[in-house]
Amino acid sequence: MRLAALATLGCAALATMTAPAMAAWRGYISHPLGFAFAAPGELKVEKGTYRGDVAGQHDTLVYRFVDDNIEYKAVVIDMRDKANDAATLLGEAEYMFGNGKKVLMDTFGRVDRQYGRKLTVDLPNNGGRSSAAFYFVDGRIVSLQATVLPANGDYDTPEMGRFVDSITFFTIRAPDDAIELPAPPK
């Protein structure tokens, strides 16, 4: 009996030591933007520009995380000046995400009364695999995107889906210890 317990304990210790170091997942929330999600790694906030043939040029806010050679991004594109064209703008963003890539999955999705689309694509030149969800909420395109880089190589990792599916638009569903997302840099 003692030998079995000792063997089990030894195997558990060995399994713990061989597991890759991964950052803990934390909840993040933006009350002004009205959404929450979970992500691992250190948060970096960036401003950018989105350009589309229909949408034109718009400011973006990107919350970026990298862990274990997987890049996680929450992208917010301010489209309040064209909110009446929501379906067209959302379709254009999805098209641009999948354009020139091998589309593996393209499906409709719904989260908390918000309809959207989910896509998974293989990046060109063996550049990795990316999965994303797009929603049009309150005049903004909100997209969660996870990209497994070639250095990771596990293109079927559940971490992409865990990130993309963690979004909620009912901020009350965010964890109590969720970190408030900072305002964009000026």
Predicted ranges, named:
Residues 1-4:
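Positively charged n-region of N-terminal signal peptides that target proteins for export
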Residues 7-16:
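Bacterial N-terminal signal peptides
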Residues 60-87, 142-146:
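A short acidic-to-branched-hydrophobic micro-motif
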Residues 23-42, 183:
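Short N-terminal segments immediately surrounding and downstream of signal-peptide cleavage
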